[in-house]
Amino acid sequence: MVQSCSAYGCKNRYDKDKPVSFHKFPLTRPSLCKQWEAAVKRKNFKPTKYSSICSEHFTPDCFKRECNNKLLKENAVPTIFLYIEPHEKKEDLESQEQLPSPSPPASQVDAAIGLLMPPLQTPDNLSVFCDHNYTVEDTMHQRKRILQLEQQVEKLRKKLKTAQQRCRRQERQLEKLKEVVHFQREKDDASERGYVILPNDYFEIVEVPA
């Protein structure tokens, strides 16, 4: 017969590969056996010679150290249990079933005119509704502001491009003016000295009387 734990809710069974030992009720010591029965707290439970409790319900000081936690001390009593009373569990389940689940306020129909009326705004529902509106309004305002900023950036970019083009045109005009001034100065100098500047294929400058 496979040994199993008699504690309520414990599913431990003997397995040679698991470090769990099983200890029979001390039937030959009635006073100690009653302590075990009281600790188990099972209604109408009477231990037999096959009844046992696994080592998981005993504290470490209940075992003899020299026996590698396989033998109990003479007055050891199990104290580690997770009690769940059946009737309490049933009552909890029944109370949970009886509690109505919260539901949002339903729309009402006015019998006199047959129109669907909006749901009654309770304080909680109204608070959530207002918070939602604030969030939507903030988001719309932010999107509108972003669009305005993007439009401003685009306008500034166009203005910058136009200014750069105007600057380049002015630089070209300035270069042309410099060339004209330089040419005019050379022309004036040649006129004052009575020289005529000939093309490059001439190798000398011919002086003419003024």
UniProtKB/Swiss-Prot annotation:
Coiled-coil regions, chain positions: 137-187
UniProtKB keywords: Cell cycle, Coiled coil, DNA-binding, Metal-binding, Nucleus, Transcription, Transcription regulation, Zinc, Zinc-finger
Pfam families: THAP (PF05485)
Compartment(s) where it occurs, according to its Swiss-Prot or TrEMBL record: Nucleus, Nucleoplasm; Nucleus, PML body
GO biological process: DNA-templated transcription; endothelial cell proliferation; regulation of DNA-templated transcription; regulation of mitotic cell cycle
Domain of life: Eukaryota
GO CC annotations, alphabetized: fibrillar center; nucleus; PML body
UniProt tissue specificity: Highest levels in heart, liver and kidney. Lower levels in brain and lung.
InterPro entries noted in UniProt: THAP1/10, THAP_Znf, THAP_Znf_sf
Keyword Cell cycle on entry: yes
Task performed by this protein: DNA-binding transcription regulator that regulates endothelial cell proliferation and G1/S cell-cycle progression. Specifically binds the 5'-[AT]NTNN[GT]GGCA[AGT]-3' core DNA sequence and acts by modulating expression of pRB-E2F cell-cycle target genes, including RRM1. Component of a THAP1/THAP3-HCFC1-OGT complex that is required for the regulation of the transcriptional activity of RRM1. May also have pro-apoptotic activity by potentiating both serum-withdrawal and TNF-induced apoptosis.
Membership in a protein family: Belongs to the THAP1 family.
Complex and partners: Interacts with PAWR. Component of a THAP1/THAP3-HCFC1-OGT complex that contains, either THAP1 or THAP3, HCFC1 and OGT. Interacts with OGT. Interacts (via the HBM) with HCFC1 (via the Kelch-repeat domain); the interaction recruits HCFC1 to the RRM1 promoter.
Protein name: THAP domain-containing protein 1
